[in-house]
């Protein structure tokens, strides 16, 4: 039964209630399943957690009418959000915080139980394991529990597979494999017949799927399916082979074998080691192949491939691996195991994009990042430890999250996935993946200066993705996502520099499929620690909770604006709203309210002063007089009310208020930062000179971070200030239309400078300055990049979604 409440204010201190309907489909007790259960997939049933609310994301169109629709939408939603309803806000806030706490505990229990990867069982791999004869020669099955799993898990329609998603490739492969296993041991003929009937009734769907969804053909399907048919025919299982689809599969198989010659396969680890069971009828040199075996005894973590190898060799390491898997999964076998690196790095990515990673910083570092870095190599990353085959997808994800967290990873690893200007996931692959190129494109955006391989990869992946988007070819060979077209559209329209954290989260919460997302390997499978409704519902709660606080802060900003009579200086509340939005979309956490308001008020006052003195009537002499008056008042601690400059009174009053809220005496530091900015602004009236330093100092000081002399004189700090000021100056002028060869956002000089900033912020050293301090500068620069990148209509639409549209 769904937990339903109506409110926009979802945080504890609220005294007023605004009407926004939110439906959360996880009762509080269900999350506690995760909080108390330990030990992996056998104890944690994530599919009990369903998301009842499904909606189609709105298009991310750039504004086409100067932003008028966006302004009207902002005004309309503000009116809705300001409608008062009676009672219950505090009690509701307590309930929401309890739900958030339960969700956080649930996710933390997942981290506690992370082992070799939580993955669904594959009926196909289980069937191959069930085919293994007793190694001691009894004539019976080596793994009777695997046979029992097959008997127990046939679906009502006679097939085996995922009951919630139908793929002809997947269902037919799994069903035929299970029928072969049962038939080979002459048990349960009733289930065999029922399975065969399903197979024959649905074989025609394979041809249709081969036309409409060929991009989602299972990995190695053309190899393993044809081989399985040969095994079935030896057991006198009659398979209709009259469909043209079989001719296409044979052609695909021949192409794959041509790309990976047998000599190569015997000497170099390739993806074909994942499908050795597809080599029936092929003469294999097992002495050579066993030298390519992984340390755990598997063939690149594939139970089915390893089971086939055991049948051919009686290798004890193969046997040991399969015993481990069968015991772990109570008779079943997944399509790959272990998958612990894959799981860990994708979990971090999902939590970050959903905007909830801050709750798990310690767990992410100790459980995921340190582990992924430990297994990072010069060849990149694989999906599991000690696996001799590396892939571009896991390399991209590991590289990106490790670099963003300050780990030293080399971009040279990407050279192992490039040939003649083309980047590939696995060597000798026959088709390319759109999601792999999507992750490659995302990885290239955290490049440091001089990393030419990432420059090449970025151009390649961007061109590939643009072509796929233009052709509307979104089907992928590795995963079925709820809204990949939406994810791709956002990534192409808003590159990382121009993607504000809360904007990305607002869209991704709608794009993320929760436990409905399905992965594609040799069969379809689920990764419940990567895709689940616990993350989704926690992200919704968290977003709406933060948004409610942001709306209350926006009310205080409006009150400050009106009481200070700032409209008399030629600025509007729309400018105020944008200033607050840029701050809230960048620094969104509830506990950082002081920093957020300091950012917003500082930015708006800079804009107010700059705009006021843009007037031709206000000359350079007046700017000079204004600055001198400000210095006289704050340096001599004079009474501000005695000045004729109302703007100075407003500014100093605001700085005093920020000091009071901070709880530390930062007034002199704030005044000094403003004086420094004014001295750069005064000569030419250029408000963007020194803007990054003033904004960053205001934020950092309001957070309670005071600067020591060692910090201020540190070479990296001086470089950080200089580079950030330069970028914000160029980007600010670019937005205002003051274009020159240095201020165009597409100019390579800005791109190189952004790469330098990324390196300065994300490359750690033992004697470096505070990461929090560096991240503040980076957030400010990104906000300038975003504002220069987006047109007015786009910004208005984002303001609506981030500040006034609750997630449902």
Curated annotation (Swiss-Prot):
Residues at which substrate binds: 256, 477
Span of chain positions assigned to the transit peptide in the UniProt entry: 1-50
Compartment list: Plastid, Chloroplast
Keyword Transit peptide annotated: yes
Pathway: Secondary metabolite biosynthesis; terpenoid biosynthesis
Cofactors required: Mg(2+)
Family membership noted in the UniProt record: Belongs to the terpene synthase family.
Protein name: Copal-8-ol diphosphate hydratase, chloroplastic
Gene source species: Cistus creticus subsp. creticus
GN (gene name): CLS
